Curated annotation (Swiss-Prot):
Entry's family note: Belongs to the universal stress protein A family.
Function per UniProt: Required for resistance to DNA-damaging agents.
InterPro entries: UspA
Pfam families documented for this protein: Usp
Cellular compartment(s): Cytoplasm
Keywords assigned by UniProt, alphabetized: Cytoplasm
Protein name: Universal stress protein E
SUPFAM superfamilies for the chain: Adenine nucleotide alpha hydrolases-like
GO CC annotation: cytoplasm
Length: 315
């Protein structure tokens, strides 16, 4: 079955070019499905206008929404004329991430696409507070799109956690690989690589325990990771030459390998309770994300429950 048949694109209000919408159309052309172009807007100055009656305030708000809707329609004009099914929705809300997630739940959207801003000098992607909230709390996969064309022959790199003995991590690893393979098959038969990072011996252990042999320890850790990677790749009939078990910190290993492979996208798993973490615990994943220079797809476990609740109020 084709994936991502009900996409939600978060529109960037500050620029005419919309890379996330472009990527959604690119996916639509290959796997079908429909697209909702969604923009939450809020202007505090309208709320401060005490001289206006509630009706006048509502009318002003509605005027801004209408203007923005027409602006998005103009950005999407070429796609709409080509018959791409794009629904446009603009809402007034002062917490963008909340209303985006509420829209995802209410509309049963199976993928969220949003533009990732790029630091001009560093080439690294900059994530806004709204981006982080979505990556941590959105129940559907979130695709952060970099403002660049998909690289010719761009590969997909899946970051997996080979160290954990927790069963939910194994299930999440398998979900990441399965969904990426499925997507890759439908989009240009993209080549899929897997990566796992393993830690080096802490120096202080070697100092405090003179009889401790770091090389034996490192070999044992590497061996465990290689066995775990072998079990995972064999489950999906993946060739050994596209799997990578690398020594070092995930936030160094994964971005470096992504750059070396000229990956178009890195796929990460996240476990909601601890923030981002599939290949990592705590903030490690967030450091990985901070170092990436390509698209990012973040996927949650099947049992993930978002802390964001549906808004009962009808604006």
């Amino acid at each position: 079955m084709a994936m991502y048949q009900n996409m939600l694109v978060v529109i960037d209000p500050n620029q005419d070019d919309q890379p996330a919408l472009r990527r959604a159309v690119y996916l639509h052309q290959r796997i079908g499905g429909k697209i909702k172009a969604f923009l939450p807007i809020y202007d505090f100055s309208y709320e401060m206008t005490t001289l206006l009656s509630p009706d006048e305030r509502t009318a002003m708000r509605q005027g801004v929404i209408s203007q923005r809707t027409a602006w998005i329609r103009e950005q999407a004009k070429y796609y709409l004329e080509a018959g791409v099914p794009i629904e446009i929705k603009v809402v007034w809300h002062n917490r963008p991430f909340e209303v985006i997630i509420q829209e995802v739940i209410a509309g049963s959207h199976d993928l969220v696409l949003k533009m990732a801003h790029q630091h001009d000098r560093l080439e690294a992607v900059i994530f806004t507070p709204t981006d982080w909230h979505l990556l941590r709390k959105c129940p559907s996969p979130v695709w952060m799109v970099k403002d660049q064309p998909w690289p010719e022959g761009g590969k997909a790199l899946v970051a997996v956690n080979l160290a954990s003995e927790e069963p939910y991590h194994n299930a999440l690893n398998e979900k990441l690989v399965k969904e990426t393979l499925q997507l890759a098959e439908q989009v240009n038969h993209t080549e899929v690589h897997l990566v796992g990072a393993y830690p080096v011996t802490p120096i202080n252990i070697a100092i405090e325990l003179p009889e401790f042999d770091p090389s034996v320890y490192n070999d044992a850790i590497r061996g465990q990771h290689l066995l775990a990677m072998k079990a995972l790749r064999q489950k999906f009939s993946i060739d050994e030459k596209v799997t990578h078990v690398e020594k070092g910190l995930p936030e160094e290993v994964i971005p470096d390998l992504a750059e070396h492979l000229q990956a178009g996208i890195v796929v990460l798993g996240t476990v909601g309770r601890t923030g981002l973490s599939a290949a990592f615990l705590g903030n490690t994943a967030e450091q990985v994300i901070d170092h990436l220079r390509c698209d990012l797809l973040v996927i949650k476990p099947d049992e993930y429950q978002t802390p964001v609740e549906l808004d009962d109020e009808d604006d």
